[in-house]
């Protein structure tokens, strides 16, 4: 066997008939499979042991030679070689065809490859191949033309007329003869001449033909190899036949298809031997052709061959295609050993890096390790006895198990794995029962809950794998989310409400205004009932020496609450004392306003002071982020565990419950509703009198009811008691939101009808009062729609993620610095007066391209090529800088990836990114994972303005990344200049916008309803939108440069996500957009040997030009092309990656003709062939590290005086 890690690249090509015979270990002559009586393979059949190898290890068919000592001997009686039975998975056979047969892939695909080489239409080819028409191969002296088609009758007439002065053939052999006569060199030269003057359709066809002919010339494939003389038979163990209970057999469809080919082939041979009439032979040849077509790609032409129950048989092509095909089912994802799955349950007492492993699972997973240890400790004499001990569940096995699982991390995975946090490593802890225990804080990353979710567990075996699991994948390291660098492990639900309740302040609580010496005294007072958790008290500041108070503050008394003292006790040493949930307190230290001079009256102060809000979920998240920034991983994971324990403990003690009495009634509700009814009546009256249109009436009614609902909501919020448990749940961010409340205590409001339109009939009741039957019925529409929407959204979002991953999988950080001289000028993204993404978010964690100066005094804030951290970003914003030029993936020069400087900070660690990081996959996951949270629907602007609907949410993201023509497009100006006039033409329903540029004047016609973005007299740049709507990037790239197009796409994608409150770092979006613009279309080839119109990778194009320039030639010119992600993924340089994505047969057909070589740079191609993945620790740089001897060996120790003497000499 070859070692997969030894080869550099993989090539694919057409197989010549000789090659097929060379691979083969023998010809399959009979359609038989196995003998049903003896169950032995039949001789010369599809499972023949002489051809494919023995069915049992080291045993020939007749049993003369058994055992490994006869290895390599061929039995003289049955002719079977004595070897391993595994060879039945590797050895091929072949079938010698009695007549040549065309390969359906090359005849059928679009465009038909055979048709292009022969310059014939697929229609004519079909007539020839399937024996409907003859074709002239050699016209000789006759007036016939080469490649002329003749019907049966015409052929007979010409034959009687000219005799054997011409040659015409039919079927596969005719095609073979034609292909053999093609002179590729001559054709190529003719086409190149033709291209010089051709245009339109003719030119396109010529370019296509030249492309294919050059492909044949370059790859060394011969066109006649598209016709088969012999077909390979794949190894029998890849198309097995198994016996079912009851003596019946189940077999792979391929065997049926092969049998048909062999049957027809044998019949044809017999007919030829018998010299049968031509028509019978022709019919048999046609049937053979169809049988081979069905074997290669069943159903591609005509009706598919069906098996029992009219089920189409699965041919060789189907074995590769789709989710169940070879690529996606077996090569990209395999089932693995040492794995298990079980239901998960909550493990509140676990540490951040632990998981609970049920004993029975541990026994099975760690079996070999336990066996080795049992033998090692002398508890079992050999491995067999050790296995027996485990099966018997002896007592000493359990002691060994405890030690074996120590320090051995395991991987936990929950499907669907939407981002890289879906697989994390934990240290196992044995638990009883059969459910695995998961740490409550790890739930958010996995999106897991405990309502019956299952998870899979995997065991890293080798020392390297264990080391990587421990160092890179331990759950404690995954505190920040890769998409935005915000903590992903934040306390939720009970933990939030516990800490919220703990940090609440209550006026007039028991013991208010007491002053304590230190935390221990406070605890004592609390336990003895002198104070409550919510009591506001004073504490000597110098009793907390580890808190960073100022010197002045240390002499004073801190006003805080008992609960806050307890909360601050869990924070790391040296972290600020948190007294208020403000950013100022968190970043700049405890504010002076919370301190008292000694001697001031504390009670008087407390009466004047407002209550401070408790700590909500968002603030806890900020605290974690700040701790992570200051103390890094270890301290943060310890804090998280303490926060979790405190939250659970305090929420239990708080005794929060929800009862019907907690849902208050709003006394003003009837008045508000009556007023709304009155307004609706007024609007209806206006409509009846014809003062307003029906649409306007509808809009107003909807508006009235929405206002009424908002009014009720507002008043509910004002009357809520901050101690109300429902309010606390929502306010703390533990569960629920305002609208849930309005529905419980206010009114449910308007509902959507099944068609998505909002019904004018509002639901006036709330759930506390109960709904009427009609109201209940109206509500159900929404519930059903919600369910279906979610289901559809999940599928759509998953498919989007798959396409994104596929297009960006080979983007890896490949070098430290690409040395580019271009940067990206960025500013905040805003729409009108709504801020979409502030500048701070955009520059944080990026490298500068140029220095940034303070606009007021000209001081340098940061130099070029430096990383912008939080402090510097804050400085830049405070200095009032509006634009910064940064290093960006858009301008990075690294081929097949990005460099560290252009990428910037790794969002998941907060440090600079390292070489080897698979940033493309991370980017795809970061954009795809929140996809399920985006809405599915298109928002209708509705109303009188009659503007086109704007697409939002998931459909808009797909529209952008697939670069489709947008719905509701905006017209763009192709010139820079002034808007001269906007003239409306009500008769036509249009308006004309005239723009006067420096050289020419352009006029654009828009519908009269379009909302304008420009006014008369405006000065606009080319590429600016004239009306509201989405710009088509394909149009934009024609009038602007690539960078502005990329910038536009970036802001459009960010707009969609930010509107839904989802933050994604720019760099992820940049990587995806860069992948859409990696290709160029060659316009003029210059002196290169590229064909005009070729789609090329930018880097390949640059390299070709570089070589041409060095040789003194004229370089080629090209223009950038924007491809949708599906198209871009299929156009990748790796045929393995493209074939495993979509359109498998088309990709492979094309790759085979071109003799493509897959350089194996991306991740997918390496996964497919089983090579180590070239990212992370699999990068070649990291794998070729050799220890180096740094200093010379010191023979004998020198005396100090000698050394001193030497030093002095060198100094002098």
From Swiss-Prot:
Annotated SUPFAM superfamilies: beta and beta-prime subunits of DNA dependent RNA-polymerase
GO biological process: DNA-templated transcription
Co-factor binding comment: Binds 1 Mg(2+) ion per subunit.
Cofactor(s) needed by this chain: Mg(2+); Zn(2+)
Region span, Disordered: 1193-1212
Family: Belongs to the RNA polymerase beta' chain family.
Name listed for the protein in its UniProt record: DNA-directed RNA polymerase subunit beta'
Species assigned in the record: Pediococcus pentosaceus (strain ATCC 25745 / CCUG 21536 / LMG 10740 / 183-1w)
Record gene name: rpoC
């Amino acid at each position: 066997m070859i070692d997969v890690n030894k080869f550099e690249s993989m090539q694919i090509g057409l197989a010549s008939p000789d090659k097929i015979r060379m691979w083969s270990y023998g010809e399959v002559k009979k359609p038989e499979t196995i003998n049903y009586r003896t169950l032995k393979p039949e001789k010369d059949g599809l499972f023949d042991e002489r051809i494919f190898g023995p069915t049992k290890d080291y045993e020939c068919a007749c049993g003369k030679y058994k055992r490994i000592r006869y290895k390599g001997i061929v039995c003289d009686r049955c002719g079977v070689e004595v070897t391993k039975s595994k060879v039945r998975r590797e050895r091929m056979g072949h079938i010698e065809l009695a007549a040549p047969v065309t390969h359906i892939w090359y005849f059928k695909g679009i465009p038909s490859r055979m048709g292009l080489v022969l310059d014939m239409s697929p229609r004519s080819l079909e007539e020839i191949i399937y024996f409907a028409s003859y074709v002239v191969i050699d016209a000789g002296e006759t007036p016939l033309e080469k490649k002329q088609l003749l019907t049966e009758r015409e052929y007979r007439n010409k034959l009687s007329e000219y005799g054997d002065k011409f040659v015409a053939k039919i079927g596969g052999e005719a095609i073979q003869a034609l292909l053999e006569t093609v002179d590729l060199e001559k054709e190529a030269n003719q086409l190149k001449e033709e291209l010089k003057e051709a245009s339109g359709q003719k030119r396109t066809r010529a370019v296509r033909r030249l492309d294919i002919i050059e492909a044949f010339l370059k790859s060394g494939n011969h066109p006649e190899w598209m016709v088969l003389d012999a077909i390979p038979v794949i190894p029998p163990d890849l198309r097995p036949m198994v016996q079912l209970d009851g003596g019946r057999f189940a077999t792979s469809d391929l065997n049926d298809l092969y049998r048909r080919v062999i049957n027809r082939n044998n019949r044809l041979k017999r007919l030829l031997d018998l010299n049968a009439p031509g028509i019978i032979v022709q019919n048999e040849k046609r049937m053979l052709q169809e049988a081979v077509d069905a074997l290669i790609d069943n159903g591609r032409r005509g009706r598919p061959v069906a098996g029992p129950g009219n089920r189409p048989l699965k041919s060789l092509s189907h074995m590769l295609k789709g989710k169940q095909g070879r690529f996606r089912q077996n090569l990209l994802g395999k089932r693995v050993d040492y794995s298990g799955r079980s239901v998960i349950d909550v493990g509140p007492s676990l540490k951040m890096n632990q998981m609970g492993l049920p004993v029975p699972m541990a026994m099975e997973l760690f079996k070999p390790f336990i066996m080795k240890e049992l033998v090692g400790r002398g508890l079992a004499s050999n491995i067999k006895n050790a296995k027996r001990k485990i099966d018997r569940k002896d007592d000493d096995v359990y002691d060994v198990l405890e030690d074996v699982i120590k320090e051995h991390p395991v991987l936990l995975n929950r499907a669907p794995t939407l981002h890289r946090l879906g697989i994390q490593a934990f240290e196992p802890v044995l638990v009883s029962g059969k459910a695995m225990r998961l740490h409550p804080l790890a739930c958010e990353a996995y999106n897991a809950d405990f309502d019956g979710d299952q998870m899979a567990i995997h065991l890293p075996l080798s020392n390297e794998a264990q080391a990587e699991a421990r160092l890179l994948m331990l759950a404690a390291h995954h505190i920040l989310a890769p998409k935005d660098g915000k903590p992903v492990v934040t306390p939720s639900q009970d933990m939030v409400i516990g800490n919220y309740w703990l940090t609440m302040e209550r006026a007039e609580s028991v013991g208010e205004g007491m002053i304590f010496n230190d935390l221990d005294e406070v605890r004592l007072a609390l336990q003895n009932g002198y104070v409550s958790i919510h009591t506001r008290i004073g504490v000597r500041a110098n009793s907390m020496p580890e808190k960073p108070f100022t010197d002045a503050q240390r002499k004073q008394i801190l006003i805080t609450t008992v609960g806050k003292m307890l909360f601050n006790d869990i924070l790391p040493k040296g972290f600020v004392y948190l007294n208020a949930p403000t950013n100022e307190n968190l970043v700049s230290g405890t504010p002076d306003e919370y301190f008292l001079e000694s001697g001031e009256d504390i009670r008087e102060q407390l009466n004047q002071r407002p209550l401070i809000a408790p700590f909500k979920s968002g603030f806890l998240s900020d605290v974690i982020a700040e701790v992570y920034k200051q103390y890094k991983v270890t301290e943060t994971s310890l804090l998280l565990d303490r926060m979790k324990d405190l939250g659970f403990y305090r929420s239990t003690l708080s005794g929060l419950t929800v009862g019907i009495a907690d849902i208050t009634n709003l006394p003003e509700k009837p008045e508000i509703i009556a007023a709304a009814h009155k307004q609706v009546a007024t609007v209806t009256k206006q409509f009846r009198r014809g003062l307003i249109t029906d649409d306007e009436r509808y809009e107003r009614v909807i508006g009235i009811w929405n206002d009424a609902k908002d009014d009720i909501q507002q008043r509910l919020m004002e009357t809520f008691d901050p101690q109300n448990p429902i309010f606390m749940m929502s306010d703390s961010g533990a569960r629920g939101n305002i609208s849930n409340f309005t529905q419980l205590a206010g009114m449910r409001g308007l509902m959507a009808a099944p068609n998505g339109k909002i019904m004018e009939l509002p639901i006036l009741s709330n759930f506390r009062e109960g709904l009427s039957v009609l109201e209940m019925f109206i509500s159900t529409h929404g519930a059903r729609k919600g369910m279906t929407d979610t289901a559809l959204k999940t599928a759509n979002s998953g498919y989007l993620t798959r396409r994104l991953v596929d297009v960006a999988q080979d983007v890896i950080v490949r070098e430290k610095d690409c040395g580019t001289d271009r940067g990206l000028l960025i500013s905040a993204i805003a729409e009108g007066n709504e801020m979409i993404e502030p500048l701070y978010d955009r520059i944080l964690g990026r490298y500068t391209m140029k220095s940034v100066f303070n606009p007021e005094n000209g001081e340098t804030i940061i130099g070029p090529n430096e990383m912008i951290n939080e402090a510097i970003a804050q400085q830049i914003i405070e200095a009032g800088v509006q634009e910064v030029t940064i290093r960006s993936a858009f301008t990075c020069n690294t081929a097949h990836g990005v460099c560290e400087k252009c990428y910037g900070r790794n969002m998941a660690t907060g440090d600079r990114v390292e070489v080897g990081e698979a940033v493309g996959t991370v980017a795809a996951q970061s954009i795809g994972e929140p996809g399920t949270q985006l809405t599915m629907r298109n928002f209708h602007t509705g109303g009188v303005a009659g503007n086109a609907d704007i697409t939002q949410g998931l459909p808009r993201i797909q529209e952008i990344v697939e670069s489709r023509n947008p719905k509701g497009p905006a017209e763009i100006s192709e010139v820079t200049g002034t808007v001269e006039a906007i003239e409306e033409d009500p008769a036509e329903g249009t308006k004309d916008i005239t723009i006067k540029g420096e050289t020419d004047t352009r006029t654009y016609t828009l519908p009269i309803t379009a909302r304008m973005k420009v006014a008369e007299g405006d000065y606009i740049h080319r590429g600016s939108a004239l009306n509201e709507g989405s710009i088509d990037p394909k149009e934009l790239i024609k009038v602007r440069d690539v960078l502005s197009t990329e910038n536009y796409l970036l802001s459009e994608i960010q707009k969609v996500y930010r509107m839904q409150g989802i933050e994604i770092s720019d760099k992820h979006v940049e990587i995806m957009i860069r992948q859409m613009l990696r290709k160029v279309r060659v316009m003029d080839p210059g002196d290169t040997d590229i064909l005009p119109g070729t789609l090329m990778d930018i880097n390949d194009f640059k390299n070709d030009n570089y070589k041409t320039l060095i040789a003194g030639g004229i370089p080629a010119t090209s223009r950038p092309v924007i491809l949708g992600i599906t198209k871009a993924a299929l156009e990748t340089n790796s045929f393995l990656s493209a074939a495993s994505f979509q359109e498998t047969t088309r990709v492979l057909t094309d790759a085979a003709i071109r003799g493509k070589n897959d350089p194996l740079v991306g991740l997918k191609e390496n996964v497919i062939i089983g090579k180590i993945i070239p990212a992370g620790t699999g990068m070649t740089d990291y794998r070729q590290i050799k220890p180096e001897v740094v200093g010379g060996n010191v023979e004998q120790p020198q005396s100090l005086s000698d050394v001193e003497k030497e030093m002095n000499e060198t100094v002098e």
